[in-house]
């Protein structure tokens, strides 16, 4: 008796072959997709899997998580800043000239801090826009993971999720504020900063002092770990200003507020904002106002603006205009920062200061 077999018609053979090809195509395309995802092809620097709270289409992000990562980024960047300074090998160079004609300095501290801060934030939140002072080398990517834990001090202040669309978020990083002072070993002025703006408005700020390891953070309509002082003198104020143009501000300040006005020359915008607050750092000077009269970059001021705003304070141009943290990376109109005083009255008192800064 002949062995039993299965006969297929030519049509059956064709269907069988098509099914087989379909299975092979599905397996192969899935393999390629996995490989592309693994290597971050088609994504941002530091790509890969979407971070917490970030869907494939952009989705939403929780500002509490962004605050947690921002604090960690500022501290990690600060570790690099401190390590380089203590090694005394800064590899200092100039990126060019500032508008005032001074060298715009950069060191290994700037570069290494920037790398840590950028890739930590980018790995955690790949769908948000990140602006940073230093260039990010796309050929030197690093995946720096976050454990997705929100610290208890943040949860205590901000108990519920604060979701916003990822596409509305812009992050501003200053990996080393006060580079000039850093090269002079004036350590107290140095900070690392992260700011999160939503639709151009500063809502979250972190200022970290690497050499004293003090960190201030705040979220607008959320909470903070820093507070304003109990009183400020707006009649004869102590005014903190840039070391590079203290004389320019002093002349106008004395005319406006009188001879009892004190001018405090200082480095770094982060340090100057902290001078307005109740900071438990013995090296931190105290001021009533912060005035700046020349061009300044947004990564220098965004974190401080968010913190002041969260505490009921103000940071505006010298003419009283709010600062938008979208578009260009700098502002032309000078700067006035205050807390617990009549800010608009101060603006009206300083009508000529902006003109002085643009001679």
UniProtKB/Swiss-Prot annotation:
GO molecular-function terms, A-Z: 3'(2'),5'-bisphosphate nucleotidase activity; 3',5'-nucleotide bisphosphate phosphatase activity; 3'-nucleotidase activity; metal ion binding
One Gene Ontology term from the biological process aspect of the record: chondrocyte development
Residues modified by glycosylation: 259
Entry EC number(s): 3.1.3.7
Residues recorded as bearing N-acetylmethionine in the entry: 1
PTM annotation: Contains N-linked glycan resistant to endoglycosydase H.
Similarity section: Belongs to the inositol monophosphatase superfamily.
Protein name stated in the entry: Golgi-resident adenosine 3',5'-bisphosphate 3'-phosphatase
Gene name tied to this protein: BPNT2
């Amino acid at each position: 008796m002949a062995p039993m077999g299965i006969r297929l018609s030519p049509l059956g053979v064709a269907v069988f072959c098509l099914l087989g090809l379909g299975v092979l195509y599905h397996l192969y395309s899935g393999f390629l997709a996995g490989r592309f995802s693994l290597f971050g092809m088609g994504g941002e620097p530091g790509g890969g899997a979407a971070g917490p709270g970030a869907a494939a289409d952009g989705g939403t992000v929780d500002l509490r998580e962004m605050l947690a990562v921002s604090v960690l980024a500022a501290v990690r960047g600060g570790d690099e800043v401190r390590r380089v300074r203590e090694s005394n090998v800064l590899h200092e160079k100039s990126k060019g000239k500032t508008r005032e004609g001074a060298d715009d300095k950069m060191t290994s501290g700037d570069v290494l801090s920037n790398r840590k801060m950028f890739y930590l934030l980018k790995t955690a939140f790949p769908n948000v826009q990140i602006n940073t002072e230093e260039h990010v080398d796309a050929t030197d990517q690093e995946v720096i993971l976050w454990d997705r834990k929100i610290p208890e001090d943040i949860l205590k202040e901000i108990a519920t999720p604060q979701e916003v669309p990822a596409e509305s978020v812009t992050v501003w990083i200053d990996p080393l504020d006060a580079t000039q002072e850093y090269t002079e070993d004036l350590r107290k002025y140095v900070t690392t900063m992260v700011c999160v703006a939503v639709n151009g408005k500063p809502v979250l700020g972190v200022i970290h002092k690497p050499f004293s390891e003090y960190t201030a953070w705040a979220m607008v309509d959320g909470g903070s770990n820093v507070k304003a002082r109990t009183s400020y003198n707006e009649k004869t104020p102590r005014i903190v200003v840039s070391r590079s143009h203290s004389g320019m501000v002093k002349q106008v300040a004395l005319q406006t507020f009188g001879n009892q006005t004190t001018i405090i020359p200082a480095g770094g915008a982060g340090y100057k904002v902290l001078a307005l607050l109740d900071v438990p750092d013995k090296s931190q000077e105290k001021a009533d106002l912060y005035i700046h009269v020349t061009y300044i970059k947004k990564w220098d001021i965004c974190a401080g603006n968010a913190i002041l705003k969260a505490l009921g304070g103000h940071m505006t141009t010298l003419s009283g205009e709010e600062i938008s943290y979208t578009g260009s990376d700098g502002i032309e109109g000078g700067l006035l920062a205050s807390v617990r005083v009549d800010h608009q009255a101060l603006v009206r008192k300083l009508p000529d200061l902006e003109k002085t800064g643009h001679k």
